[in-house]
Design a protein with these regions (language model features):
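Active-site/ligand-binding-proximal alpha/beta "capping" segment
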Residues: 198-254
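Short beta->alpha connector loops at strand-helix junctions that form conserved
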Residues: 86-88, 126, 152-153, 175, ...
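Structured adenosyl-cofactor binding patch, chiefly the S-adenosyl-L-methionine
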Residues: 106, 143, 158, 163-170, ...
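Amphipathic alpha-helical repeat scaffolds
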Residues: 49, 129-136, 255-262
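Arg/Lys-rich RNA-binding interfaces used to dock onto structured RNA substrates
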Residues: 7-131, 271
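RNA substrate-binding interface of SAM-dependent RNA methyltransferases
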Residues: 112-206
Length: 274
């Protein structure tokens, strides 16, 4: 993770006679970070709201803080960050992705991509494209103390605004390296003797299958919303798990669970066994 910058409070902002307004280029820059290609080009991503900004500040290098005086006072700011104080009258929707934005935005440097490691239960998202689902899975992982969530090919960018918002600060604690080759990565860890579990519609019941302790190395693969786990990734899985539907319904049941809900059920049962 990035180094932690020194922080200090910014009481001097309330004494400024004039507000520093955003330039046209600054507005274009902030809006451009909504798209992945510009995040990669600028090596930066944006976070909105005092809660999320406050959670991310100790873990990512802050490049820029933009907000009203009240919002800026709610957080500490790194000494080397550019600070732009806006008047209450500024229409924050000009730079925000939110319908009802809180007038605070931070721009952070993208972190160096960590190497994939397995420490306890590790999640792998195979083509999970929906940003809301990816963010919710990161939040679920954080809740259960899972520190490693890998992003397989085709998964949503974790630094997109929707994923950042849905993760509710989990990116401060969960490391999500994108995998250059999902199959090769799984094959490598399989050779190290690490079991690879996968969530399928058909498999051994989660509630009957033997599971390793939560702290023991294991990989759990979650497939995309539409097609599930891809065939090439499925070939590397050692244990197939399924969440059985309730037998109480006599007229059938819904075809499948949302991937984020399935992740929460799987992680909860894994933790309960430990």
């Amino acid at each position: 993770m990035p180094c932690v910058p020194n922080c200090f409070e910014v009481p001097f902002l309330e004494d400024l006679d004039d507000f520093i307004m955003l330039s046209v280029n600054q507005i274009k820059f902030l809006r451009s970070l909504r798209e992945r290609k510009y995040r990669l080009r600028e090596q930066a991503f944006a976070v909105e709201g005092p809660k999320l900004v406050g959670e991310m500040l100790p873990f990512y290098r802050c490049r820029m803080l933009v907000g009203t005086a009240a919002m800026l006072r709610a957080v500490s700011t790194p000494h080397d960050a550019e600070v732009v104080e806006l008047p209450e009258s500024f229409d924050f929707k000009r730079i925000s992705t939110q319908t009802s934005p809180q007038p605070l935005m931070a721009v952070f440097d993208l972190p160096a991509e960590p190497e994939p490691v397995v420490e306890g239960l590790t999640l792998l998202l195979d083509g999970v494209q929906d940003p809301g689902n990816v963010g919710t899975i990161l939040r679920t992982a954080d809740w259960f103390g899972i520190r490693h969530v890998w992003l397989g090919t085709g998964s949503a960018d974790v630094f997109s605004p929707k994923v950042v918002q849905a993760s509710m600060g989990a990116l401060a604690r969960v490391q999500p390296p994108p995998l250059k080759n999902t199959v090769d990565t799984l094959a490598y860890f399989r050779r190290q003797g690490i079991p690879v579990y996968g969530a399928f519609l058909e498999g051994q019941s989660l509630y009957e299958a033997p599971l390793p302790n939560f702290t023991e190395p294991a990989i759990l693969v979650l497939g995309s919303e539409g097609r599930g786990i891809s065939p090439e990734v499925a070939a590397e899985i050692t244990d197939r798990l399924t969440i059985p539907a309730s037998g109480l319904s006599v007229k059938g049941h819904t075809e499948s669970l949302n991937v984020a809900i399935a992740a929460a059920i799987l992680c909860s049962e894994w933790r309960r066994r430990s």
